[in-house]
Design a protein with these regions (language model features):
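Conserved HGGG/HGGXW glycine-rich cap/lid loop of the alpha/beta-hydrolase fold
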Residues: 53-105, 124
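Catalytic histidine-centered segment of alpha/beta-hydrolase-like enzymes
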Residues: 281, 304-317
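Flexible "cap/lid" loop of the alpha/beta hydrolase fold
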Residues: 157-202
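Short beta-strand/loop motif that positions the catalytic acidic residue
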Residues: 267, 273-275
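Conserved alpha/beta-hydrolase "acid-adjacent" motif
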Residues: 280-286
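Conserved alpha/beta-hydrolase catalytic His-Asp/Glu region
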Residues: 170-171, 197-265
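Active-site loop/oxyanion-hole signature of alpha/beta-hydrolase fold enzymes
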Residues: 94-140, 144
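The conserved beta1-alpha1 loop
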Residues: 68-72, 138, 275
């Protein structure tokens, strides 16, 4: 698993965004990975979703079983250090959300709900020539993962839920802060709406923030996030996250807040839930009770926050590989 502590520049990132947006979906796959000395297995390319929205997809091009990753809302590959390790043993395919990280906004701005995210996931699978595979989800991506598993079960062979619940996500926020359950969704929704109201002025500030070593340590020792194993890569993940306009992020979040709890009785594939004990965005209790509704599902709780794959990459990756072994044994 990746635990390098070298600084990684991101100048290559901004220089390629314009070219990515101008390429057609059928163009030659783009080689825009960081320099080889950075040690990251990462390549971006374009995929067109069912409604014509052009997505910025990515893969690590690693030999191994295929894993579709439904990432956290508005996040990026750099939040997954273990999956960017050339020796991780897992071939990942994923994409950046609509209007995020080089993916276009849809013509209809309301097409940003979980149903559309499932369409995007299917487009990525189809483009990669993958008939069915295991699926991992993080945070809001757990909603997408379970929605895909329920609506298109023939495409899913296993499920790995990290720091997320299968729907009704806003109702799971704030548990470690002792916010009563009845108040969690109203408070989370109010915060998301406030971000939308102050979006443009706030984005002008956050998009100019220098996320250097000191700022990075403040974030990773804030309690919201706990200390990480790869600080340079975490800083890159934070910098990239802050490039998304705040009002658009609010729009995406509010759309996902409408996603109801997914019924789990039909899930019949190997499933693992990995929760963070101190996660303020996805209550570990809710993840545990969700796991109890799926026969033979495994539940693991780690001493970490919402960002377990950055704080405990070795442990999370080992659990992922164990899930993939169960999928392989099932055939």
């Amino acid at each position: 698993m990746c635990s390098r502590d070298m600084d990684r520049g991101c100048a290559w990132e901004s220089s390629e965004v314009g070219r990515l947006r101008g390429m057609s979906a059928c163009a030659e796959p783009l080689s825009v990975a960081p320099a080889p000395e950075d040690g990251l297995a990462l390549r971006f390319y374009e995929v067109t979703s069912a409604d014509g929205t052009v997505l910025r997809a990515w893969t690590n091009d690693v030999e191994g079983p295929v894993l579709l990753l439904c990432n956290g809302l508005g996040t990026n590959p750099y939040a997954w250090p273990s999956l960017l390790d050339p020796d991780c043993g897992v071939r990942v395919v994923s994409w950046n959300h609509r209007g995020v990280g080089g993916s276009a906004r849809p013509t209809d701005p309301d097409r940003v709900g979980q149903e559309e995210f499932v369409e995007d996931a299917l487009a990525v699978l189809d483009d990669a020539g993958v008939v069915a595979c295991a699926v991992a989800g993080w945070s809001i991506g757990v909603n997408t993962m379970f929605e895909l598993a329920v609506t298109r079960p023939e495409r899913v062979t296993g499920l790995f839920a990290l720091a997320g619940v299968p729907g009704e996500t806003f109702g799971s926020m704030g548990a470690p802060l002792f916010i009563p359950r009845f108040a969690r969704k109203p408070i989370a929704t109010a915060v998301a709406r406030l971000l939308g109201l102050v979006g443009n002025p706030l984005h002008r500030v956050t998009s100019r923030l220098e996320i250097g070593p000191c700022a990075g340590r403040v974030v990773t020792h804030s309690g919201f996030m706990l200390p990480v194993t790869d600080e340079p890569l975490a800083r890159l993940a934070i910098r990239e996250f802050l490039t998304t306009p705040t009002d658009w992020y609010s729009h995406l979040a509010l759309a996902s807040s409408l996603h109801a709890r997914v019924p789990l009785h039909s899930i019949d594939v190997p499933t693992t839930f990995v929760a963070g004990r101190y996660d303020v965005l996805a209550a570990s209790h809710d993840m545990r009770t969700a796991s109890e509704r799926i026969p033979s599902a495994q539940y693991v709780e780690l001493p970490g926050s919402h960002f377990l794959q950055m704080e405990k990459p070795r442990e999370v990756h080992a659990l992922l590989l164990e899930l993939l072994d169960r999928v392989a044994l099932r055939g």
